[in-house]
Amino acid sequence: MRVVIAQCSVDYVGRLDAHLPMADRLILIKADGSVSIHADDRAYKPLNWMTPPCTFEESAIEDIDGEDTGEKLWLVENPKGEQLRITIAQIHQEIDMDLGEDPGLVKDGVEAHLQELLAEHIETLGEKYSLVRREYPTAIGPVDIMAKNSKNEFVAVEVKRRGGIDGVEQLTRYLELLNRDDLLAPVHGVFAAQEIKPQARTLAEDRGIRCVVLDYQELRGIESNELRLF
């Protein structure tokens, strides 16, 4: 990431020409090749930008006599031939730093948190449900939640934020394995998610797996009536 605060003017040459007159601005040049120009307003929105892939060239600007004016031209061009022509009159501050790979945004409500909340409120799945343990180990990987129902029978629970066919297939494999163990069988299946895709619901119900749509806010103890059991 290259962060530059500079006095500059910007010309966009492409489908429509646009010009930003000389002023102090923030210029961001990211490792992915994108370039954006910002003013001290407009929140996060840039005044102008170029998305990757694009090329970046820097050259000195000379006057008509071939003398160096002290200004720099930054030329950013994409494969379509569109250009950002940034004229740098003066650089006030500049930082060039490798930020490395970003871990991404950790959102409130991802699967790990849903699993934790559902384990804490296991009665969401039905009256007299009890928690056996989270991350119940099997030979093919851990089951998100192992619980017992009102009949004291084991229930394997797969927790997803968005439930698709892959999640149903995964739970099916767990159930097939667990039901081979006479000490556990019969083991029932619950597919729990904030959102369950129609194809996944159809497949789950065809295999005798119960679907539970989770209300994240209700699990957090916030008043809501949106929890639906199917």
Curated annotation (Swiss-Prot):
Keywords: Cytoplasm, DNA-binding, Endonuclease, Hydrolase, Nuclease. It is found in: Cytoplasm. Pfam families: NucS_C, NucS_N. Gene3D superfamilies: 2.70.180.20, 3.40.1350.10. Transmembrane segments: none annotated. CDD domains: NucS-like (cd22341). Coiled coil: none annotated. GO terms for molecular function: DNA binding; single-stranded DNA endodeoxyribonuclease activity. Its main location: cytoplasm. The keyword Transmembrane helix does not apply. One of its GO terms (cellular component) is cytoplasm. It is an enzyme of class 3 (hydrolase). Its EC number is 3.1.-.-. InterPro entries: Endonuclease_NucS, NucS_C, NucS_N, NucS_N_sf, Restrct_endonuc-II-like, tRNA_endonuc-like_dom_sf. Belongs to the NucS endonuclease family. HAMAP family: NucS. Cleaves both 3' and 5' ssDNA extremities of branched DNA structures. This is Endonuclease NucS.
